[in-house]
Amino acid sequence: MFEDPRERPRTLHELCESLNTTLQNLQVQCVYCKETLQWADVYNFAICDLRVVYRDRSPYAACKRCVIFYSKITEYRRYTCSVYGATLEALTKKSLCNLLIRCHRCQMPLGPEEKQRIVDEKRRFHEIAGQWKGLCTNCWRPRRQTETQV
């Protein structure tokens, strides 16, 4: 479909422009399970700003179920370390606002409010596969109470 690797669309929006279609009408398969993505999966992939991959010159994306599943596998296999926000800023010499940090569960890029929430809650950012990760608002779970009241 796309012969020249340099001219291949990298996002779903670019792919839609190349194919002269809309996200709603886009037919693309999941690179992992090979199922055709439902419209909700297409929108989720686009909102997460993930990149299209190519196999045999054909574009593939990933359904939400596979993104979550393979994110967990990557976390188990490629976890490096966890650091607090101030330490991360010192390590990278960049403000948290200027760092691309994705949710380690759904791969959504974190906004400034989500990054600040992680700092305020004294949670850590994680280095997984050479990228910094945290938790987005949708995947956030409150900490369990470890003490019981009598």
Swiss-Prot record:
It comes from the Viruses. GO terms for cellular component: host cell cytoplasm; host cell nucleus. GO terms for molecular function: DNA binding; PDZ domain binding; zinc ion binding. InterPro entries: E6, E6_sf. The keyword Transit peptide does not apply. A zinc finger (unnamed) spans 30-66, 103-139. Its main location: host cell. The keyword Transcription applies. Coiled coil: none annotated. A motif (PDZ-binding domain) lies at residues 148-150. It is found in: Host cytoplasm; Host nucleus. It holds the Pfam family E6. Keywords: Activator, DNA-binding, Early protein, Host cytoplasm, Host nucleus, Host-virus interaction, Inhibition of host innate immune response by virus, Inhibition of host IRF3 by virus, Inhibition of host RLR pathway by virus, Metal-binding, Modulation of host cell apoptosis by virus, Oncogene, Transcription, Transcription regulation, Viral immunoevasion, Zinc, Zinc-finger. GO terms for biological process: DNA-templated transcription; regulation of DNA-templated transcription; symbiont-mediated perturbation of host apoptosis; symbiont-mediated perturbation of host ubiquitin-like protein modification; symbiont-mediated suppression of host cytoplasmic pattern recognition receptor signaling pathway via inhibition of IRF3 activity; symbiont-mediated suppression of host type I interferon-mediated signaling pathway. Plays a major role in the induction and maintenance of cellular transformation. Acts mainly as an oncoprotein by stimulating the destruction of many host cell key regulatory proteins. E6 associates with host UBE3A/E6-AP ubiquitin-protein ligase, and inactivates tumor suppressors TP53 and TP73 by targeting them to the 26S proteasome for degradation. In turn, DNA damage and chromosomal instabilities increase and lead to cell proliferation and cancer development. Belongs to the papillomaviridae E6 protein family. Forms homodimers. Interacts with ubiquitin-protein ligase UBE3A/E6-AP and thus forms a complex with human TP53. Interacts with human NFX1 and MAGI3. Interacts with human IRF3; this interaction inhibits the establishment of antiviral state. Interacts with human TYK2; this interaction inhibits JAK-STAT activation by interferon alpha. Interacts with host DLG1; this interaction leads to the proteasomal degradation of DLG1. Belongs to the high risk human alphapapillomavirus family. The cancer-causing human papillomavirus E6 protein has a unique carboxy terminal PDZ domain containing substrate. This is Protein E6. It comes from Human papillomavirus type 26. The gene is E6.
